[in-house]
Design a protein with these regions (language model features):
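Conserved, well-folded catalytic cores of nucleic-acid-processing
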Residues: 43-50, 75, 87-95, 116-121, ...
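The Walker A/P-loop phosphate-binding site
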Residues: 2-125, 143-147, 158-159
Length: 416
């Protein structure tokens, strides 16, 4: 059945007459950028159903949505900056004009450590990574993002690429190559007059700093989508100093916890990730590394239901391990059987291993395939959970639309 609205057609025609792109442009179809950590990518992903007269298929759109803000929250030492850098590197590395702009208000790691986490060669690091750790304030941080935005949207012919994906109607999706901005951290960001010698005890109080940063977030958000800038905002979970317990700023923050910098940074985030570290790991046992178990919880998401968490493994030497994190996911979903040095995946009891040697075992192609197949099986359950069929014609005909029936009955009564 073909649908047509005279008002919609007339409205679009009037907008076209303005010749103003800001008036003409409509919402762009979202594209996900994998972070390299598949458990998170899938819990934040969606299934896209492409349906045209000639073809019909579904694909997984996983990872961080283009042109969005992601808040990373957690206590000190839980791995927020490490994970953010690794995710950022995995997003931009495949692109010729990919770029990371890192604002390090809390000083930062050595360049060699950052390059290791980004998994970049020395040449890539120099070409794609821009950082500063002095002279940062609210005003010039905005100016730098605005410059990035203007450079990209005014030179689309340089930065635009074919994603290779289609929207639900089969139209090819084109995007500007992604740029990642990292602010580390919001709690340390202050206005220029305060950083350049203003009196802390003067008119600029903690509350007014939060208000200025709130305006910053509101000004930056509209710039992100059109330029495909992904903004990672690192923030802390701090104890609430209030003597009277009050409702948490957002669900899945506990009573007595707060995030500094104002509530707008929470409400306007496309994703809010809570990072919680737990038990330590030692090289002489466990997984054969010195590190820690970490849970990543999707506190807020505009693509999937919130509250879902996945396990990850932080290796103190190399950062978060994609492979060990997948292994932790398989354990959580009870795909690892056996005990001690005689573990096996699923029903593959002919391929036994010790978890301390799991990384070595993955070098065996046959074992790697078993591992990947089991991982895909679990990941598919993560992306399917909370995803609904958007094709109206194919929705379950056993579902009864009570609301429509009641409204129709009311209209019938009025007509009689």
């Amino acid at each position: 059945m073909a649908f047509k609205s005279a008002l919609v057609d007339s409205f679009r025609g009037e907008m076209a007459k303005t010749k103003d792109p800001t008036m003409i442009n409509e919402s762009q179809f979202d594209v996900g950028y994998p972070t390299g950590y598949l458990a998170f990518d899938f819990i934040n992903g969606t299934k896209v159903e492409v349906r045209t007269e000639k073809t019909s298929y579904t694909y997984n759109s996983i990872g961080i949505v283009d042109g969005t803000m992601v808040s990373m929250i957690g206590r000190a030492g839980c791995g927020k900056t490490t994970l953010t850098l690794q995710m950022a590197g995995n997003i931009v590395r495949p692109f010729e004009n990919g770029m990371i702009m890192h604002e390090e208000l809390e000083t930062g790691s050595a360049s060699t450590r950052k390059r290791q986490l980004l998994r970049m060669t020395e040449e890539e690091f120099k070409a794609k990574y821009v950082s500063r750790n002095t002279g940062i304030n609210t005003e010039n941080f905005f100016e730098r993002i605005k410059t990035l935005h203007d450079l990209k949207v005014n030179n689309r012919e340089i930065y635009e690429y074919d994603t290779g994906l289609c929207d639900t109607q089969g139209n090819r999706i084109f995007k500007l190559q992604p740029t990642v901005v990292i602010l580390d951290s919001l709690a340390m960001l202050m206005p220029r007059d305060l950083t350049e010698g203003g009196e802390i005890a003067g008119s600029m109080t903690i509350t007014s700093v939060a208000k200025v940063n709130t305006q910053l977030v509101k000004r930056i958000i509209p710039l992100l989508k059109s330029a495909n800038i992904i903004w990672f905002m690192i923030n802390h979970i701090l104890p609430d100093p209030s003597p009277i317990p009050k409702k948490a700023q957002v669900a899945w923050l506990k009573i007595g916890e707060r995030c500094p910098g104002g509530e707008t940074a929470i409400y306007l985030a496309n994703n809010l990730l809570r990072i919680d570290d737990s038990s330590k790991l030692s090289a002489d046992k466990d997984l054969g590394i010195n590190g820690i178990n970490v849970d990543i919880q999707l506190v807020k998401s505009r693509t999937k239901r919130p509250g879902v968490s996945v396990p990850m493994i932080l290796d103190y030497d190399t950062g978060f391990s994609p492979e060990l994190s997948l292994y932790a996911l398989l354990k959580k979903h009870k795909k690892i059987n056996g005990a001690g040095a005689y573990l096996y995946i699923g029903d593959h009891s002919d391929h036994k291993f010790s978890q301390k040697n799991i990384l070595k075992e993955l070098k065996d192609p046959e074992f790697a395939k078993i591992f990947m197949d089991a991982s895909f099986e679990v990941l598919e359950t993560l992306i399917s959970s909370g995803t609904t069929n958007t094709n109206i014609e194919e929705q379950d005909d056993t579902v009864v639309d009570i609301t429509s029936m009641m409204l129709s009955s009311m209209m019938d009564q009025m007509a009689s």
